[in-house]
């Protein structure tokens, strides 16, 4: 049995930055909260919780907020929400990914120039909820809309680059616009992983994608790989024990952007142990 591991695995730069800022805060403060899970990875979140980092859900303010630090995750939040939280917490640590922040700023600037902002994305995704705080009348959709006037089409940073291009083509073909701007705001790192996952999936009998069940980019990689081979998404290395490896000679492995590289090594070790037991 041969294993092909993607070259680009583990945390992306945005997640790595967010975790580094969080760990620095642990060393300086006793009471720390994150607004939602700092990353879509149960193991990492549990590890931080053991070190005193508690997860807050939206609209819940703890009694000790005045003496606590609040960490804004990489998905970002709206400016209004940030302003309100600054009034309540002792300190705000904003770990919004620079790529996501650029999307917010670009959308806001172009909207002020008189364009209608259309974003290819999932309206329920935290990143898109935050964008709404910058451009309240932005259209966020997965289905190409019929548009008119001056339009700017952008994308949620974690969407599939191929699906974004398809969305753009279909939007143009069915719209009556006077002017259109298209800005590719898909994260280059996730786009690169997408292409690599596709390349590996074409060579293997089974593709294993490691990442959180609620991770948008991990789900996207699983969807892409499944077009070419059998693909299984796992959240923890322990789930390897549930996989059927019968008639599998080639295995591909990749990860979502919130998955630590150590998980890949553990998964490989478990696969090798399974093989040796046969």
UniProtKB/Swiss-Prot annotation:
It comes from Pseudothermotoga lettingae (strain ATCC BAA-301 / DSM 14385 / NBRC 107922 / TMO) (Thermotoga lettingae). The gene is ispH. InterPro entries: LytB/IspH. Binds 1 [4Fe-4S] cluster per subunit. Gene3D superfamilies: 3.40.50.11270, 4-hydroxy-3-methylbut-2-enyl diphosphate reductase, catalytic domain (3.40.1010.20). It comes from the Bacteria. It catalyses: isopentenyl diphosphate + 2 oxidized [2Fe-2S]-[ferredoxin] + H2O = (2E)-4-hydroxy-3-methylbut-2-enyl diphosphate + 2 reduced [2Fe-2S]-[ferredoxin] + 2 H(+); dimethylallyl diphosphate + 2 oxidized [2Fe-2S]-[ferredoxin] + H2O = (2E)-4-hydroxy-3-methylbut-2-enyl diphosphate + 2 reduced [2Fe-2S]-[ferredoxin] + 2 H(+). Its EC number is 1.17.7.4. It is an enzyme of class 1 (oxidoreductase). Dimethylallyl diphosphate binds at residues 40, 75, 125, 215-217, 258. (2E)-4-hydroxy-3-methylbut-2-enyl diphosphate binds at residues 40, 75, 125, 157, 215-217, 258. Catalyzes the conversion of 1-hydroxy-2-methyl-2-(E)-butenyl 4-diphosphate (HMBPP) into a mixture of isopentenyl diphosphate (IPP) and dimethylallyl diphosphate (DMAPP). Acts in the terminal step of the DOXP/MEP pathway for isoprenoid precursor biosynthesis. NCBIfam families: ispH_lytB. Belongs to the IspH family. GO terms for molecular function: 4 iron, 4 sulfur cluster binding; 4-hydroxy-3-methylbut-2-enyl diphosphate reductase activity; metal ion binding. Keywords: 4Fe-4S, Iron, Iron-sulfur, Isoprene biosynthesis, Metal-binding, Oxidoreductase. GO terms for biological process: dimethylallyl diphosphate biosynthetic process; isopentenyl diphosphate biosynthetic process, methylerythritol 4-phosphate pathway; terpenoid biosynthetic process. This is 4-hydroxy-3-methylbut-2-enyl diphosphate reductase. Its cofactor is [4Fe-4S] cluster. [4Fe-4S] cluster binds at residues 12, 97, 187. Pathway: Isoprenoid biosynthesis; dimethylallyl diphosphate biosynthesis; dimethylallyl diphosphate from (2E)-4-hydroxy-3-methylbutenyl diphosphate: step 1/1; Isoprenoid biosynthesis; isopentenyl diphosphate biosynthesis via DXP pathway; isopentenyl diphosphate from 1-deoxy-D-xylulose 5-phosphate: step 6/6. Isopentenyl diphosphate binds at residues 40, 75, 125, 215-217, 258. The active site is at 127 (proton donor).
